Amino acid sequence: MTKELPSGYFQGPFRPYKTFQPSLTERPLSKFEQFAVFSILLISLIRLYKLYIPDRVVFDEIHLIKYIKNYYDGSIFVDIHPPLGKLIYFYITKLFSFDKDFQIDIIGDLYPEDFPYLWLRLFSGICGIGHVLLTFFTLRITCNSVISIVITILICLENSMVTVSRLILLEGPSLFVQSLVIYNYKAFTTRIPFTGCWYFNLFVTGIALGLNISLKISGLFTFAWVGILTCVQLWEILGDLRISIWQFIKHLVLRVVAFIMVPLTIYCSVFYIHFENLPNEGPGSGFLTPHFRSTLDDYQQQPLQVLYGSTITIKHNALEKYLHSHDLTYPRGSNLQQVTLYDFPDVNNEWVIETKQKYNEEKLMTDQREVKDGDVVRLYHKATGHYLHVNDIRPPISEHEYSYEVNGNETRGLLGNEDYEFKIRMLVKKPHAENDLPLIKLRTTETIFQLIHQATRCNLMSHEQKLPDWGEYQNEVLCVKEPTIPNTLWYVESSSHPLLKDTKKLKTFPKFSFWSKLIETHKVMFNLNKGFTNPHPYASKPLDWPLLSRGIAFFSNYNLKSIDEESSLIYYLGNVAIYYSVFFVGLIAIFKCAIYSFIKLNPYASPPSSSKSSPYANFYNNSWPYLVGWFINYIPYCLMSRNLYLHHYLSALNFGILLLSQYLNYRVAKNKIIGGIITATIFVSAIYCFYEFIPITYGLPWTLDQCNSHKWFPNWDIDCMTYTG
């Protein structure tokens, strides 16, 4: 007797095979669900409660406000994140009339009375409400109505999500577009292929992906999530014997267009608008090459020649940072003046290139003598009056025998001394060089060279290693014998000399295309992101996040408040009940999905005879995508060496809460009583945790005793002294 095949299976030539078909059907909203949506909307409005508190700059709001100011000034800047969020906030402010010359410098500064900070926070809050509603519509695709409502309310009451959606930050909009991606992709998988609704959800998913990767660099994780799920789905389509190769190609091409081409088009368009709004030099100029900067309206062209006596700035070719010195000294070793790399244009980056003989100002300023390959020179630091110097002492960080400390020492009047002399070895030229002359004579922005110390025969170099706090966390500069060549390469970015005022001899650049700008900007973004290694009091490790070991002090007016101002503290902290539920359910899901996958590895295993899928199978089919989403949005942080903070866990937490919904739905399907008890326990616990921490979520009044009693974990460094005033 032939065994009855379950729904979705057909008999192939040798074995049953699973067909590709929508596994779920969309159901219309019932009256109960319509009432639930209305109720959820009302509950989510609590995110907008007293948005005006505090009327001061909170945490990373300072960065967004400065970027808005840069847009008004047209001053170019560089950030680790793509510019969509900053552009949205900027265009919102353009709807209002206020003094564009506002000055906001640090966290805690009062917002000017006419600055529309409340409207900017309102936008973030509306994104938070949209995130809540989209979560409900996502959940009802695979969960029963009650579980969908419960989990959606958990999103409403998740303290960390509430906090970020009340402030001028990127996290609120980012969570909204991430939820837009998740909902539309899930809806897309339930549609009949090539219908109107199928096309709609397909392309809205692509648009949402474009917005997501244009808001935050972490949007790439969600992009990867869609990519993985799409590959799995295409594999299933390929295995369906009823689908022709041409239909498969159609599926493939449409997904490539929607999930790759559409997002990348949006992404590039956002950067184009970004560049158009920043035509002038600005705080980001120091990170950019002269070729890029030559496209800016107020870029000052530099003399092409470099003469002895020229005041120059020297940049590291790989790191794009300035050779720099200042009055600070090394705390050990020579105890002489520090030499470092610095990110920004500064007077302390200026050096005078001199001959190796005793300084003769009249000769240097009147003789037009060019610096050539093989010349031996000295570099005089204008701001501090000392010469670049190497001595036989180990550097403060790289304490190897083949390494030497680089410092500033001696002043004008110095006689010939090899410890202060460097041979210029010209190696290659920049791509924008017009001829081979930069390989013979030192040319501004064109010649890439090494500086070889005459006494020790070591190469002046720098690397990504940074000095501690006594060195202002600037990059270490040292001298090394036989180093890696890229670390030893330098170029002259700017040059000035009294004899070089002929405008016909200024350096001109060929056209720098939009794509070249885009590539260079991303190199800078990558280096900036990698360079966030300076110690921070509220940095944490990814392993601390799921168990909420510590939070982040977003704001305290302890030292800021006026006489009639109430104490206010915002401490970024998640909902303990939700975080722990997500953590333990994640462990359970990993175990269950691993077991189920192992059982299903045999392609010749007979499918279950029941025409109705078991709760276990439903749990696996609906939970593994969210488990993958949590994994992709969390694990990469464990591999990063940069500073990380609890708010980096938000995207993973969002997937974790969706995973929690599948587990509760599974428990209720298995046993309504046990499932109901687990669901009710988590729900009530989450409400309790939210209520207990409302004051530090919203910045509302509290007391010292109440604050101290809410330090549930030893690492929760909540500044309760805020409430003593």
Curated annotation (Swiss-Prot):
It catalyses: a di-trans,poly-cis-dolichyl beta-D-mannosyl phosphate + L-seryl-[protein] = 3-O-(alpha-D-mannosyl)-L-seryl-[protein] + a di-trans,poly-cis-dolichyl phosphate + H(+); a di-trans,poly-cis-dolichyl beta-D-mannosyl phosphate + L-threonyl-[protein] = 3-O-(alpha-D-mannosyl)-L-threonyl-[protein] + a di-trans,poly-cis-dolichyl phosphate + H(+). InterPro entries: GlyclTrfase_39-like, Glyco_trans_39/83, MIR_dom_sf, MIR_motif, PMT_4TMC. One of its GO terms (molecular function) is dolichyl-phosphate-mannose-protein mannosyltransferase activity. Induction: Expressed at very low levels. The keyword Glycosyltransferase applies. Its EC number is 2.4.1.109. Signal peptide: none annotated. Pathway: Protein modification; protein glycosylation. GO terms for biological process: protein O-linked mannosylation. Pfam families: MIR, PMT, PMT_4TMC. Gene3D superfamilies: 2.80.10.50. Residues 303-356, 368-427, 439-495 form the MIR domain. The keyword Transmembrane helix applies. It comes from the Eukaryota. Keywords: Endoplasmic reticulum, Glycoprotein, Glycosyltransferase, Membrane, Repeat, Transferase, Transmembrane, Transmembrane helix. It is an enzyme of class 2 (transferase). Disruption phenotype: Shows altered cell wall composition with a significant decrease in wall mannoproteins, and reduced virulence in a mouse model of hematogenously disseminated candidiasis (HDC) and using reconstituted human epithelium (RHE). Glycans are attached at N409. The chain crosses the membrane at residues 34-54, 117-137, 145-165, 192-212, 219-239, 256-276, 570-590, 619-639, 644-664, 673-693. CDD domains: beta-trefoil_MIR_PMT7-like. One of its GO terms (cellular component) is endoplasmic reticulum membrane. Belongs to the glycosyltransferase 39 family. Protein mannosyltransferase (PMT) involved in hyphal morphogenesis and drug sensitivity. Transfers mannose from Dol-P-mannose to Ser or Thr residues on proteins. PMT1, PMT2 and PMT4 account for most of the protein-O-glycosylation activity, while PMT5 and PMT6 may specifically modulate a much narrower spectrum of target proteins. Required for biofilm formation. This is Dolichyl-phosphate-mannose--protein mannosyltransferase 5. The gene is PMT5.
